[in-house]
Amino acid sequence: MKYEIIHINRFDYETPVDQSMNSIRLEPKTDECQRLLVYHTEITPHSLTSHYTDIWGNTVESFYIAEPHTHLEVKTTSVVSIQRSPFVDQLTYSKAMQDIFSSQLFRDQYLPFLSQTNYTYLEPHQVTNVKNEIGDIQNPVQFAKSLMNYLYAHFTYDSNSTNVNTTAREAIELKSGVCQDIAHTMIGVLRAQGIPARYVSGYLYVGEDSALVGDAASHAWVEFMAPGIGWISLDPTNNVEALENHIRVGVGRDYGDVSPVQGVYRGGNQNLDVSVSVTLLDS
């Protein structure tokens, strides 16, 4: 599958601002299943960008605007090619996987993705309630799949019930939210079970005939570490393995590590308008 993504963030300010310092994480990844073919950034007012790779392996572009301005527009255009086949249902929990999963080396290696954050932390009784529902499952792959099924069945997708600061422990009580909330909740339970899990930000191609649900502007899903296999992507918002409709941009411990646009400025209030289009170029 080949896609073109056009992502526009426009900030309008009540009064002229200056000394605007910003960073963006909008460049899709290149990995074993996804290839970035084209990527460029347009910034208005014009500004040059510098690039670096953060601790999680995400590409970050930073820029500085010194002149007074009443609006800021960041437009990125990307073309990506994805070839990703389903395989999670084919995995068996071998003796080798069990040995790796129970080893201290495995725990130490993935400690950042076993440690809870404010976004992902769940109260012990909340974790217990979920585990009682899905059963005592020792196989981490099967546990992750069953957890995804549970969250899909019990959460209602509602963009009005939560906001960008909502935590997993709040969302699980509401049993509603958006992809960010459902992903944080799944990550929180996985980590409580001793399964390394990370947050994935990106784009979702829903198409005209797709049953997939999500906001193309900022879809999120989960990756968990299968011992001896690698990271496996699951989308609990849609109860599917994340495959060719899912375009990976950033990974981290939670949303805070992959926020698409971050910045500071001196001036008045702002209004943000986001526009995203994901177009299928070749299937």
Predicted regions and their residues:
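Residues in well-ordered beta-strands of folded domains
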Residues: 25-27, 42-44, 77, 223, ...
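Intrinsically disordered, low-complexity N-terminal segments that are enriched in acidic
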Residues: 1-86, 93, 98
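Hydrophobic/aromatic-rich core segments of domains that either
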Residues: 149, 181-270
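A short, structural micro-pattern
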Residues: 3, 18, 35, 68-70, ...
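Flexible glycine-rich active-site/ligand-binding loops centered on an Asp-His dyad
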Residues: 94-111, 240-241
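Secondary-structure boundary elements
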Residues: 105-177, 185, 193, 253-255, ...
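Glycine-rich, flexible loop/turn motifs
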Residues: 48, 153, 163, 168, ...
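Short acidic/polar alpha-helix capping motifs at helix-coil junctions
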Residues: 3-4, 23-27, 92-94, 148-154, ...
